[in-house]
């Protein structure tokens, strides 16, 4: 669009002037009953929303592209845009519609990370706005969920740690400096570039102090030169840009510390399918499978707890004690039923602060507040045995006066929007009641005035009427005009009657005609005042919302434990994981067959387990269930096992499955080695490592050598608790030579034609993978199976056990053999006594030695 604004029509000039302030956002421009988009915005909207792109007028002979959506359907279209990561500006008609150009102004800015509208948010997900800043090769970021008031900073992260946090948070929107270079995985998320000055450290510090109305941030426990403050400053500036009238309420700024939570990198999160399965769906993920929550806020809290398990045992035990107390003393079904009737207080509280809460949401808040005594009663007995539940019940008692206020203020079923009116209950506002009396009983009031005038004048034939020209009037026959009182004012003379008005009739007319507008204005003012009153209790409401959500998750854990016979895990200060009859929490619920439970023992004297067994025998399931049991335990849940004992585990690593990275230009094997390198460089004795079939992406000897070296490194250097699944039977020799390793295998039974997977862990190794049996089960043609069997027998006959055994000995035990020539040279050197050699003899000996070396075969050097 290379035209001057002055070349356009007045309406289009107005559009372009507003658009200049929002070049990267889609501008929805209100024109009558539609919101219109023009030029490139129209083309983008047409593609994104699947709407028709037409034209409206021309400029320099070329049509101006235009697309539009009906005003009543705007929210549906905005929801579609937000799901695609797009942002939009809503420009409304704010002036009177009449002659000339209608005044318009931007009333809303919609971006994925700053949403608070109920119909645009996913109720089951946190809505994260993240601001990213790079300083001295480390990444610092601030993130906020304005729907719940959270505002956090992170420590400096490397690229892998950043990717892990992005995977955990899954931000709705990312902000970053205009000129910054970032990893490819950030670029793929389409971050919104912001001016570099938004990240200026001094400006950011001032902006944070202004927001919290302080002169320093020392009270937050954050250093004034912390680079993450630059990210926080940008985030606040962005909120200023998108919320011009009311800034979202944010709780005091907090800094997140690694030592509080179990570290899970992005690969591990994906491999363990915590929130999404490997195909990208939430169904059949761990969270979806264990979710028994009754509220949306509970689901969001459950996701946070599973995605960020605790590692400090005292806090985990608080949750455990609450689950135990609920299991022992509470009616879990009744608690769940009562919680289902509660509203999303967390998000309603934010909308109250922003003055965007709808009347119906206040009614939901009222009804929830009225439910609190019942919820409290259901939790009371359990709370006596749990400090966490006791604190929750205290929080539930903070807002009784708000419930009483809303009961008095609101009608039983308020309208959806404020402009519909009829929000407040009778008796709450006497002035409003009087206006409603006017609008609801106008006919009776006119009838009453008519009777009063008849009584005062004796004119029994007078009537009060109305027309659009003259409004309300008193009508009497012309024959009685002489008897009209002096204070009557003649309005109109007709053939058979005279029409008059009185001051009282004009006053009543004005009141009747204006009553509805006055009532709406009064309701709007009273509604704003009600929101301000409610917002004064914001902190109490947030605490109440947290108490309800956490009680919901704890009840979810208790119901899950009761339904599926989970046990309460024990914790120790040792480095260990010991599980008796452990089960996979997802597979056991999805399988129609009884799940085969298995034991696991890992500790400092049994650090690494080489796991062998048949394809499809359950190796991956066994390893994943171990990691999931640890995560559930650290989240505060009971676990699917008969017994479990978890030591000091601070981090989980996984290397499972095979996939390439086409976008990043990495082969399957390169991905495998990158993930392996991450584990070898970062795992320590407090880590749980899951390794599945290392080395299968290359040649047999390369793969076997790598697998051996990796396992050896994990045993001797990392000393992490490790499950190492492999089809290289030769690896079983490694742990036979190392006192801190052991072999285990998954058993199977076979005859000549069939195999039965027993899915049971046994001590020791197995040399068979039963790959041909699995191929047969998969439907591979019989001729191929026959040829494969023949080739297998041929290869097994050619196997040289001694050579394979020698190849896999530890490097230090493999002594190279020397040729006779080298042995001869070494022997001659050993026989020389340097002290007895004359200079001439020494010189001759050097020449002789040089001749001997020259005669050696080059391959023997």
Curated annotation (Swiss-Prot):
Cited Pfam families: MutS_I (PF01624), MutS_II (PF05188), MutS_III (PF05192), MutS_IV (PF05190), MutS_V (PF00488)
Positions annotated to bind ATP: 613-620
GO biological-process terms attached to the record: mismatch repair
Keywords, sorted A to Z: ATP-binding, DNA damage, DNA repair, DNA-binding, Nucleotide-binding
MF annotations from Gene Ontology: ATP binding; ATP-dependent DNA damage sensor activity; damaged DNA binding; mismatched DNA binding
Cellular compartments per GO CC: cytosol
CDD domains, A to Z: ABC_MutS1
Ribonucleoprotein in keyword set: no
InterPro entries to which the protein is assigned, alphabetical: DNA_mismatch_repair_MutS, DNA_mismatch_repair_MutS-lik_N, DNA_mismatch_repair_MutS/MSH, DNA_mismatch_repair_MutS_C, DNA_mismatch_repair_MutS_clamp, DNA_mismatch_repair_MutS_core, DNA_mismatch_repair_MutS_N, DNA_mismatch_repair_MutS_sf
Entry's family note: Belongs to the DNA mismatch repair MutS family.
Task of the protein: This protein is involved in the repair of mismatches in DNA. It is possible that it carries out the mismatch recognition step. This protein has a weak ATPase activity.
Name listed for the protein in its UniProt record: DNA mismatch repair protein MutS
Species for this entry: Dichelobacter nodosus (strain VCS1703A)
């Amino acid at each position: 669009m290379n035209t001057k604004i002055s070349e356009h029509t007045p309406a289009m000039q107005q559009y372009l002037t507003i658009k200049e302030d929002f070049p990267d956002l889609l501008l929805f421009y209100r024109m009558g009953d539609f919101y219109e988009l023009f030029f490139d915005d129209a083309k983008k909207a047409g593609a994104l929303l699947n709407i028709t792109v037409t034209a409206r007028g021309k400029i320099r002979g070329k049509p101006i592209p235009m697309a539009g959506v009906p005003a009543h359907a705007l929210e549906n279209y905005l929801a579609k845009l937000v799901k695609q990561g797009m942002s939009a500006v809503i420009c409304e008609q704010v002036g009177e519609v009449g002659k000339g150009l209608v005044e318009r102004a931007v009333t809303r800015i919609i971006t994925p990370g700053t949403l608070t509208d109920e119909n645009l948010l996913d109720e089951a997900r946190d809505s994260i706005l993240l601001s990213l800043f790079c300083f001295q090769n480390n990444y610092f970021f601030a993130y906020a969920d304005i729907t719940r008031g959270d505002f956090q900073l992170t420590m400096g992260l490397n690229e892998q740690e950043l990717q892990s946090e992005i995977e955990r948070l899954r931000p709705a929107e990312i902000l970053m400096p205009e000129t910054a270079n970032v990893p490819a995985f950030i670029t793929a998320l389409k971050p919104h570039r912001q001016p570099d000055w938004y990240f200026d450290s001094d400006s950011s510090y001032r902006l944070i102090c202004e927001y919290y109305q302080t002169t320093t941030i020392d009270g937050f426990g954050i250093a004034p030169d912390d680079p993450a403050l630059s990210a926080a400053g940008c985030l606040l500036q962005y909120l200023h840009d998108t919320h011009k009238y009311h800034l979202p309420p944010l709780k005091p700024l907090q800094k997140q510390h690694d030592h509080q939570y179990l570290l899970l990198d992005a690969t591990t999160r994906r491999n363990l399918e915590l929130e999404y399965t490997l195909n990208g769906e939430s169904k059949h993920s761990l969270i979806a499978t264990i979710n028994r929550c009754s509220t949306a806020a509970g689901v969001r809290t459950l996701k946070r707890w599973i995605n960020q398990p605790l590692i400090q045992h005292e806090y985990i035990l608080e949750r455990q004690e609450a689950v135990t107390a609920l299991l022992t003393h509470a009616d879990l079904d009744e608690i769940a039923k009562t919680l289902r009737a509660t509203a999303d207080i967390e998000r309603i509280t934010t909308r109250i602060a922003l003055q965007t809460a709808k009347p119906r949401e206040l009614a939901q808040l009222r009804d929830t507040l009225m439910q609190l005594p019942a919820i409290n009663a259901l939790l009371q007995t359990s709370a006596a045995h749990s400090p966490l539940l006791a604190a929750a019940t205290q929080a539930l008692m903070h807002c009784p006066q708000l419930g009483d206020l809303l009961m008095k203020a609101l009608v039983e079923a308020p309208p959806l929007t404020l402009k519909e009116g009829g929000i407040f209950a009778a008796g709450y506002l006497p002035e409003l009641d009087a206006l409603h009396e006017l609008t609801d009983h106008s006919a009776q009031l006119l009838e009453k005035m008519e009777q009063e005038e008849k009584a005062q004048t004796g004119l029994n034939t007078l009537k009060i009427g109305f027309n659009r020209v003259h409004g309300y009037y008193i009508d009497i026959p012309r024959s009685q005009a002489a008897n009209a009182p002096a204070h009557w004012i003649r309005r109109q003379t007709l053939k058979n009657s005279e029409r008059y008005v009185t001051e009282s009739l004009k006053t009543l007319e004005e009141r009747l005609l204006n009553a509805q507008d006055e009532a709406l204005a009064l309701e709007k003012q009273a509604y704003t005042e009600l929101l301000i009153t409610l917002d004064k209790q914001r902190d109490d409401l947030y605490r109440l919302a947290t108490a309800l959500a956490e009680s919901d998750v704890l009840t979810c854990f208790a119901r899950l434990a009761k339904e599926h016979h989970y046990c309460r895990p024990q914790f120790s200060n040792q480095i260990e994981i010991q599980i008796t009859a452990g089960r996979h929490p997802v597979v056991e619920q999805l399988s129609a067959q009884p799940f085969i439970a298995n034991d696991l023992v890992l500790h400092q004297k049994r650090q690494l387990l080489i796991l062998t067994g048949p394809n499809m025998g359950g190796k991956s399931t066994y390893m994943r269930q171990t990691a999931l049991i640890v995560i559930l335990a650290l989240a505060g849940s009971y676990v699917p096992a008969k017994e479990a004992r978890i030591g000091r585990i601070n981090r989980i690593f996984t290397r499972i499955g095979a996939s390439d990275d086409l976008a990043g230009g990495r082969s399957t094997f390169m991905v495998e080695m990158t993930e392996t390198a991450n584990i070898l460089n970062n795992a320590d004795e407090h880590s749980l490592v899951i390794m599945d079939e290392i080395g299968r992406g290359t040649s047999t000897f390369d793969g076997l050598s790598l697998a051996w070296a990796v396992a050896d490194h994990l045993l001797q250097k990392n000393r992490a608790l490790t499950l190492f699944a492999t089809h290289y039977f030769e690896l079983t020799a490694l742990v036979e030579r190392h006192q801190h390793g052991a072999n285990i295998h998954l058993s199977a039974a076979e005859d000549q034609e069939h195999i039965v997977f027993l899915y049971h862990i046994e001590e020791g190794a197995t040399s068979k993978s039963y790959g041909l049996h699995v191929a047969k089960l998969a439907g591979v043609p019989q001729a191929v199976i026959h040829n494969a069997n023949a080739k297998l027998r041929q290869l097994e006959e050619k196997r040289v056990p001694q050579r394979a055994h020698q190849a896999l000995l530890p490097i230090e035990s493999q002594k190279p053999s020397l040729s006779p020539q080298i042995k001869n040279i070494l022997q001659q050197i050993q026989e020389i006594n340097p002290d007895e050699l004359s200079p001439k003899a020494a010189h001759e000996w050097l020449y002789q030695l040089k001749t001997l070396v020259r005669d050696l075969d080059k391959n023997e050097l």
